[in-house]
Amino acid sequence: MVRDTRNVDLEWGLELCKPEKVNKQNLFTNIIKPQKDKINIKTDKIKFFLDNLFTEFSKFHDSCYPDGRISTRSKLRWPLLIIWCILIVFAIDKNFEVKDFLSIWINESFINENRFYSEIWGPIAIYICLFVLLLLGLIYCSKIVVKAIPLISIVIAAVVVIIAVAMVKILYICHWLIYKILILAFGIKVKPLGDTLPTHNGETGSHSKATVGSDIEQIEFQNMPTPVKK
């Protein structure tokens, strides 16, 4: 008797999915942990790649420009940019195997024909395409940054003005609300402040403009030293 084995894997998988058959430790060890390890390996690989890339470029840049800056009028700025793009292309290929992956795809596309073309000129074309795309991307990004600088300054100034106006408006509204609450809710009448000067008793009181001079003279008379009798 021949057994139908087409649904064996499905039945076995359904059997393992039953609650009594699920082992959380095995699930973590066999499924979750390997995926987590793969993600960590890729993350570490990217960090290592970026560290090496910027280290090598810093060495190259310091050897060409000891002062630490690239002049916009320097004739070597474009060769430096081209060499920098080439370094990035080779670093990307070395760390992420772009050429090997695309070469496999090209070889599969040209099976039994143009084998020499796919093995020799395929990687060269890949490198050229990567280099051109990277160079165009850098040039385009630099143009966007240069054009965006005035716009960014205008936006920042507008935001600052809006924030200042909003703060003044909020303070005014808060003052108005407090004033209305004191008058309407508590019945407090706010009197306008007059000129207040200390009286001869040491207290403060409201004075009119006519009595201000006499009060000042009285205060000066009180502060005069008393004569000493011999």
UniProtKB/Swiss-Prot annotation:
Transmembrane feature ranges: 78-98, 120-140, 148-168
Chief location: membrane
Compartment(s) of residence: Membrane
InterPro entries assigned: DUF999
Keyword Plastid annotated: no
GO cellular component, one term: membrane
Superkingdom of the organism of origin: Eukaryota
Membrane topology, from the record: Multi-pass membrane protein
One protein family per Pfam: DUF999
Keyword terms, alphabetized: Membrane, Transmembrane, Transmembrane helix
Family: Belongs to the UPF0494 family.
Protein name: UPF0494 membrane protein PB2B2.14c
Origin species: Schizosaccharomyces pombe (strain 972 / ATCC 24843)
